[in-house]
C-alpha cells in the first residue's frame, strides 16, 4: 500500500452531507465545527495515519484505496475507536483527493445487516464508479 506523502484535498461527498453529517451537526452543535476541522486536517495528511489504529485499509488497488477512519467528537472524552464514529473514505493518489463517502455512528446504520455489510451496500449502490475502480464489479473485499 502506497499513500503519497503530500497534503491531500479532502471533500465530503454529497451523500455523506445529506444523510449523516446533518445528524452530527445537530447533535454536537458547538463541538462539531472543531471536530470537522480536525477530521479534515487529519485526512489531509493521511500518510501520517497509515500506521495508526485509527485508519484501517479496507481495499487498496493502486492508485486507489478504500479506508475506514475512526474519530471522536471533540469534548466527548471517548477514544476514536470506542466512540463508534466512523468515516469510509476513498483515496485517489493520482488526483490527490480524499473523498469522504460516509460519515456515521455505527448505530446509524440499518440493524438487519452487520456494520460492514451495511456500509458495503451503501458504497456499492451510491458510488458505483468508485466500487468498480476498486473491485472490478466483484463483491469481495
Per-region residue spans from a language model:
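Arg/Lys-rich, positively charged N-terminal/basic patches that mediate binding to nucleic acids
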Residues: 1-44, 129-141
Amino acid at each position: 500500500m502506497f499513500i503519497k506523502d503530500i497534503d491531500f484535498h479532502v471533500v465530503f461527498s454529497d451523500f455523506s452531507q445529506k444523510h449523516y453529517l446533518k445528524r452530527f451537526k445537530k447533535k454536537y452543535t458547538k463541538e462539531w465545527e472543531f471536530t470537522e476541522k480536525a477530521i479534515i486536517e487529519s485526512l489531509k495528511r493521511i500518510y501520517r495515519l497509515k500506521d495508526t489504529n485509527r485508519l484501517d485499509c479496507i481495499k487498496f488497488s493502486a492508485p486507489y484505496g478504500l479506508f475506514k477512519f475512526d474519530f471522536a467528537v471533540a469534548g466527548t472524552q471517548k477514544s476514536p475507536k470506542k466512540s463508534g464514529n466512523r468515516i469510509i473514505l476513498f483515496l485517489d493518489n493520482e488526483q490527490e483527493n480524499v473523498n469522504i463517502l460516509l460519515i456515521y455512528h455505527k448505530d446509524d446504520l440499518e440493524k438487519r445487516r452487520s456494520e460492514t455489510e451495511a456500509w458495503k451496500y451503501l458504497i456499492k449502490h451510491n458510488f458505483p464508479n468508485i466500487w468498480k475502480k476498486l473491485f472490478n464489479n466483484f463483491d469481495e473485499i
